[in-house]
Amino acid sequence: MTTQNQTDNQTTSRRSLFQAEFNNESLSNAEIINKRRVINGYDDGLMQVSPLKHPWAREIFKNMQRNNWVAEEVPFQKDKEQWESGALTDQEKDTFLRALAFASNLDGLLVHSLSEIIKPSITSPEVSLAIARQIYEECLHVDSYSVMIEAVGLDPEDVYGLYRRDKSLYYKNKRVWESMFKIKRHNFDTQNTEDAKLFLEACTTNLIFEGIFFFSAFLVFYNFGRHKKMPGSKEMIQFINRDEDLHVQLFVNIINEIKREQPELWTQAVQDKMAQNIVDAVQMEYEWGCSCIGDGILGITPDTLKEYIQFIGDLRLTAIGLPKVFNTKNPFPWIDEFTQGNMIEVNFFEGTVREYQTGSLEW
């Protein structure tokens, strides 16, 4: 016996799109657009973007295009000279390597999460376009870290292989991997309410990765730049940070749009789970950041690092409609000189971002 869910799946599945006989009385274009959703919507697989059902996704996609850059634009000669000349202390070198190690590991994991977990469930073509562009940008970041490693003259094993020697990084990567792929199973289907809730949780997980887990590393690189150290690395991170901020905006909009389209998913239990995941991520990022800076480095202390990560955590909570937990202020106001125009700290619901010039950090 065919269930209603099976019938619905057949009408929305790309696999069954052209299996039926031609019927010129099938859904009209307007009906197709009206049936679109971020997930569980009508999906003919033809990627017809216009007219738009989700204009915020197209806007983000266009801003991603305007941000286009390549790693070879960034000069690293000064970084190489400083690394080899003793301009950095042993502690500073260790902090630099640890920050670079996790950032490079995480971008690699994100490529898999987006392509294998998130994108297959998206049924809105304009949202799918933005996710595809994000996958490209994560690949660009992976390549950029490689360029940085080679240009500065670092041993790749010291960066990519650190998790095999460092217990804290190993377990952080392990927790990231497990949280990313908890929904990856053969019979996962967002038509099922519980699976749709898991997908919403997976989107929040990606928001955490993009919007919390990079930030102690970004802080380290910007702090080096503030002290006139490793300027090329700082510039590379500015490019990457600018991309990540749009990724954060994309997932905030995805989460909020799913809430609007399928409010039955946004139960109190789901809200509590999302909030706890963000709170746990803040603690995890703080612990990792402390392992990088030790008792403190170049003005960053464990206490100020904690305040900063908590400040970021509250931004992510409020962006998806959850209350603040930490109520801390940004203890590093100087960071604005490096992130001006690309740190997203305000109302995500407005769906607006600054426009940038291609291949430039001028805004």
Where are these regions (language model features)?
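Non-heme di-metal
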Residues: 2-363
